[in-house]
């Protein structure tokens, strides 16, 4: 992974699912980011579940959230991270499936 990616803001701890590649998972609703170290064979659904547990522990259903890479939703979350086009240092966006109203 490049030095640039490791210098980006994220929580100090890393979620370790296995050895392989390091990606960032960003959740704009909570303005937070986690690093995930994962094997390239890990399904996106497992990465999503681990990141949700860390970023949004309010018992939200996995089905309420989508994972995006480069602005596009990853429609089949059962595929390995290596088949999504993600590379070491990529950032996945984890966000609500439906837009939520802004309250002031």
Could you tell me what each predicted segment is?
Residues 1-104:
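Ubiquitin system architectures
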